[in-house]
Structure formats: structure tokens, C-alpha cells
Amino acid sequence: MAPSSPRPALPALLVLLGALFPGPGNAQTSVSPPKVILPRGGSVLVTCSTSCDQPTLLGIETPLPKKELLLLGNNQKVYELSNVQEDSQPMCYSNCPDGQSTAKTFLTVYWTPERVELAPLPSWQPVGKDLTLRCQVEGGAPRANLIVVLLRGEEELKREPAVGEPAEVTTTVPVEKDHHGANFLCRTELDLRPQGLKLFENTSAPYQLQTFVLPATPPQLVSPRVLEVDTQGTVVCSLDGLFPVSEAQVHLALGDQRLNPTVTYGNDSFSAKASVSVTAEDEGTQWLTCAVILGTQSQETLQTVTIYSFPAPNVILTKPEVSEGTEVTVKCEAHPRAKVTLNGVPAQPPGPRTQFLLKATPEDNGRSFSCSATLEVAGQLIHKNQTRELRVLYGPRLDERDCPGNWTWPENSQQTPMCQAWGNPLPELKCLKDGTFPLPVGESVTVTRDLEGTYLCRARSTQGEVTREVTVNVLSPRYEFVIIAVVAAAVIMGTAGLSTYLYNRQRKIRKYRLQQAQKGTPMKPNTQATPP
């Protein structure tokens, strides 16, 4: 408040004496206006009057800065009171010869609060948990006309007079999903309408509420229980019943390795999918973590993943290619903790290696030796296989099945001479008549007299050679007629001979029966006698 200008001590003394020892006269002092409401720091004009009709001492007593503006005769003065900072009661006084008197005017100062502040809201508020709102108000007058209102948007939550300095108003409200994103604020109302002024409002800075729901159930984590070194696996983490689901943060990690999931959101659920790669440095048991953070809460699921190294078993042949009759050692070796089996080997105690010995035969050419290894990892059986093929070198072969020794074909017919030589490596085959004329093996030819004859088939390879004679017979049309005639004659003669035999047999039977009848020998019914 600005200091007032120096005032003479005499008026104050006169006022005091007039108040203590009022005179017997009827002179009165009045003031206008008797009541004033004005903004803080404002000015007001006050008129002091007296009814004394004689020269008198007229003035105003106030701590406020004052300025005499107008003298209306000896019994009325107008003063300007300025920089009114608080409620005040200036007093007009007059000292008439027949007595002293005083009159007061009541100055009421109004001003809106200097601070209206809503306490900050929690960054996140769980749905279902009550929220406490607190508003502080500093300053503001007149307090009898000052109200504090707490609001959610435009909805009033509480209305209360401002009491105390600073005034504080609190309320507790339940929190629901629908309140997510709602603005909360505090407002003051200085209602001076009854005094002919208006309603003055001050509003705090708003705070937006963020609500959330994170279920008590941990997220579901799906991943391989075991994972082989230098391979990839897929991890999926999911959870239902979240709100707002788009604000959920998902963290996936394998040991110290942070994963980068692709997150798919539903209405109130999410699914996070990530690929995980492991190396030899990760071998052993690792913790796979899925953590979901929403608001101020989190849920976490832990699961162990066993990282293992299990190379395929090694199948070892003494030599992958041997000659017929050579002894070959077949070995199978695997991880020290694995158990191996090798096809063709008699049952042996389980272990990481096995072997057997064989003598190579042509039938072993192209034979596959398969080794199966089994390793138990975290209760799961892991299987690996490896196969090696044996090549056996053996000499050429020509046999009756694949290279018949005799062919008989009609002249002018279409025929395909077939002669297959076997061996490893596959032998070269040539069939020649008289050392020069080749037999077109595997080709369709028209049979002529030139094709007839004996051919020497020779199969040759790095493992040796073998020969075989084959004969081609060509039947001309005249030979076909002779053969048909001979066959027909044989059929006719056979038929005639059979008829003669049957006729003689029946004749002998009748002759025998006649002789028996002449001797009186009874004949047994339904029994034929054996002919002599």
C-alpha cells in the first residue's frame, strides 16, 4: 500500500475530542456514498457534509491517499480517495461551535484470486480406483462471495465456499473407462451480481486423465523350449483384456538379447511376434522374458529356453570307392552325449560311436550307410541323421538274362537286339561278327539274311573285360512252309495213331468178354476185365 501524505494533527485531535466530548448542539455530519464496492487499487469520490450553519472545521479521516477536489461552501467537501487496496472505513468529521459529529463510509474492495491451481493428476490412473482432486486458491475478495468449483469437463463434481488462505477444496471420484482422456479443472466464481456488478470467473490449467486396465493374469508366451545354435525360432507373446490396448508396451528379450517384435492390436488384446537367432555364445539355459507395461503397472512372464549345439553325426568310410573284395570299415561318430545307431550293425550298447567291417561285393555298389544320432535336450529327444554311399568297382558282366545267347527271328520282321553289360564303371560293349560286322544292339532293325550268324560280344572297362557269343538265326519264308508242313503232318499222324489205339483196345475188350462167357465164368457187374 502506498504511504499516505502527511496530515495535520489538529483535525485528528478535534475528531477525537468530538467523539469523546460531544457538544450539546444539533449539528450533524453526513457522508456520501455510505457504501462503496470497488476493485482493488481503485479510486472513489467521497462527499463529507455538515448541517452546521456556522463556520466549522470539516474534513475526512482515512489512511488512504486523499485529495480535496471541491469545496461547496463552508459545510460540504468532496475528496478523492485513491489506491484502495483493502476494505476501509473513512470517517467524515465536523466541529461546529455547538458540537462535534462524525459519519463513516464503508469501502469494500473486490479482486479475483491470484492463483487457482489444481494439483497435478497421476500420469495414469487404474480403472476402479478412486481419484482425489485437490484445488488451492490464493487471494480473492470478498470471500463471502467467492466459490470454488471442481469440474470434469463441464460436469460439476463439487462446489464449496473459499475458506482460509489459501483456500483448499478436495473431492474423491471413482474412475471408469469412459473417463479416459477427460479434462479436470478448478474454477473460482466471484459473484458480485447482487452488488450490481457481474460474475467473475478464474479457471486453473486443465489436466487430462489417462485411465488404464491391465489384467492380473500374466501374458501368454509361446516359444520353442529348445533351440539349436545358428538357427532361428519364433516367439509369440499375447494378452487379452487391456485398455487402452494401443498404449501397451511390449518387451521381449532372450537373456540380454532384446527382440524386436511385430505387434498386432485387437479391440482389447495384442499379439507380439518376434524372431530370435542364437549363436554358440548363447549355449545353455536362457531366460525368455515377455513384459507388458501399461500405465503404472506391468505383468511379466518368464520361460526357460535351452540353447544347444548338436552337429549331425559323421559317417566315415575307409574309402568311399573301393574295388570288389576290399574290406571297408564303416564308422559313425556323434556328439559325446548322443546315442547313435548305424544300419546293418548288430545291436551294440548305446553310445556316441559305432562301427563295423564288410567285404565289398558288387551288390554293395551304391549302398547307403545311414547313421542316426539321438540327443536329449531339456527332456526332448533331438534326432540327426547322416548318410554316406559306397561305390564298389567291379569287372564287366554278361549273362543269359541280360544278353541271351540265341535269337531266332523271321526274315523281314522288325526286331531289337538286346544285350546289356553290367559293371562299375559301366563297361563299353561291342558285338561283332567276323570281327567287323556289328550287331546293332538296342536298335530296331529289319531282319535280313545278312544279320544271321554268330557274334562275339565283348564288354570292357578299367576293371577288365568279358566276352560272350550270341547267335542270330533268320527264318526265310520256305523254311516257314516246311515247318508248317512238318507240324501239320505230325498232328495228322498223331491223330491217326490215337484212333488206331482206341479201336484195338475196344476190340480186345470184346474178345476177352466173349472168352469168359464161353467158359461159363460169371462176370462181375460194372467191372471191366483187364486185357491180357
From Swiss-Prot:
Disulfide bridge partners, by residue number: 48-92, 52-96, 135-186, 237-290, 332-371, 403-419, 419-457, 431-457
Gene Ontology MF term list: integrin binding
Motif placement: Cell attachment site: 152-154
Alphabetically ordered keywords of this record: Cell adhesion, Disulfide bond, Glycoprotein, Immunoglobulin domain, Membrane, Phosphoprotein, Repeat, Signal, Transmembrane, Transmembrane helix, Ubl conjugation
Entry GO CC: external side of plasma membrane; extracellular exosome; immunological synapse; membrane raft; plasma membrane
Presence of keyword Membrane: yes
Topology, Extracellular side: 28-480
Glycosylated position list: 202, 267, 385, 406
Keyword Signal: yes
SMART domains for the chain: IG
Transmembrane parts of this sequence: 481-503
Subcellular location(s) of the protein: Membrane
Annotated ranges, domain Ig-like C2-type: 41-103, 128-193, 230-297, 325-378, 412-464
PTM annotation: Monoubiquitinated, which is promoted by MARCH9 and leads to endocytosis.
Cytoplasmic compartment residues: 504-532
Modified-residue entries (Phosphothreonine), positions: 521, 530
Signal peptide: 1-27
UniProt xrefs under InterPro entries: ICAM, ICAM1_3_5_D2, ICAM_N, ICAM_VCAM, ICAM_VCAM_N, Ig-like_dom_sf, Ig-like_fold, Ig_sub
Protein family membership: Belongs to the immunoglobulin superfamily. ICAM family.
Primary role: ICAM proteins are ligands for the leukocyte adhesion protein LFA-1 (integrin alpha-L/beta-2). During leukocyte trans-endothelial migration, ICAM1 engagement promotes the assembly of endothelial apical cups through ARHGEF26/SGEF and RHOG activation.
Stated name of the protein: Intercellular adhesion molecule 1
Gene behind this protein: ICAM1
